[in-house]
Amino acid sequence: MQVHERSHTGGHTFQCNHGNEKKAPAAGKVHSEGGSARMSLLILVSIFLCAASVMFLVYKYFPQLSEEELEKIKVPRDMDDAKALGKVLSKYKDTFYVEVLVAYFTTYIFLQTFAIPGSIFLSILSGFLYPFPLALFLVCLCSGLGASFCYLLSYLVGRPVVYKYLSDKAIKWSQQVERHRDHLINYIIFLRITPFLPNWFINITSPVINVPLKVFFLGTFIGVAPPSFVAIKAGTTLYQLTTAGEAVSWNSVIILMVLAVLSILPAIFQKKLKQKFE
């Protein structure tokens, strides 16, 4: 016996078979899916190379650095890398304000677009380099734009990956999205504040399960603010930190939990009122 779960997403259908029977896929279908995956990979690599070329141009017009400083200009992988990078950027920030800002902006968006680790250290660095209001706006904007570009990338070429490797998880999240469809922006904000779903998973599956881009961007822009607040505040004491984990205290965790609950309260009240009047 077969039980089918379906989630219709923009002309595409998720389908899972539960049971002991498994039908062998038709040869034509396998060939078609293989060709689609190869084409998607080719497009993805082309887009990545174009983005990498933009990054190269940005750093080509960066201020001339010494060999020692050039070694420190890299995506931070730990707190020591972040401190070294912060030292170099702070040296040139006042004289080459626009160049440093553009380099920070493009790097952050590049990492977010291609789901490359390291943006947490850039969030911490923003608190070290810039005044708090500018740093918070910059991180929220970069996160919103980078996540939206990742969304668009998934919309263009990521569907075969989602269908092949993440279909079960995507079906479950699709069901959650449908339950929260009337207050979707609150749900996206809640997910961005909390660690229940990885950000990369939210980014690449959202277009497949019909989360509107506008709602996705606004929910991300607002939702990343509370955790970014914590990282930016930690950045003001950058040289006292030894790991990224030290940026998060129990007080900040409690505050994030409270904000997460507040973000979903309007949806809960709306649902209760709707049930009452029905």
Swiss-Prot record:
This is Transmembrane protein 41B. Phospholipid scramblase involved in lipid homeostasis and membrane dynamics processes. Has phospholipid scramblase activity toward cholesterol and phosphatidylserine, as well as phosphatidylethanolamine and phosphatidylcholine. Required for autophagosome formation: participates in early stages of autophagosome biogenesis at the endoplasmic reticulum (ER) membrane by reequilibrating the leaflets of the ER as lipids are extracted by atg2 (atg2a or atg2b) to mediate autophagosome assembly. GO terms for molecular function: phospholipid scramblase activity. It comes from Xenopus laevis (African clawed frog). It is a multi-pass membrane protein. Residues 127-238 are annotated as: VTT domain. InterPro entries: TM41A/B (IPR045014), VTT_dom (IPR032816). The VTT domain was previously called the SNARE-assoc domain. As there is no evidence that this domain associates with SNARE proteins, it was renamed as VMP1, TMEM41, and TVP38 (VTT) domain. Keywords: Autophagy, Endoplasmic reticulum, Lipid transport, Membrane, Neurogenesis, Transmembrane, Transmembrane helix, Transport. The keyword Nuclease does not apply. Belongs to the TMEM41 family. Signal peptide: none annotated. GO terms for biological process: autophagosome assembly; nervous system development. It comes from the Eukaryota. Residues 1-31 are annotated as: Disordered. One of its GO terms (cellular component) is endoplasmic reticulum membrane. It is found in: Endoplasmic reticulum membrane; Endomembrane system. It catalyses: a 1,2-diacyl-sn-glycero-3-phospho-L-serine(in) = a 1,2-diacyl-sn-glycero-3-phospho-L-serine(out); cholesterol(in) = cholesterol(out); a 1,2-diacyl-sn-glycero-3-phosphocholine(in) = a 1,2-diacyl-sn-glycero-3-phosphocholine(out); a 1,2-diacyl-sn-glycero-3-phosphoethanolamine(in) = a 1,2-diacyl-sn-glycero-3-phosphoethanolamine(out). The gene is tmem41b. The chain crosses the membrane at residues 39-59, 96-116, 142-162, 184-204, 212-232, 249-269. PANTHER family: PTHR43220, TRANSMEMBRANE PROTEIN 41B.
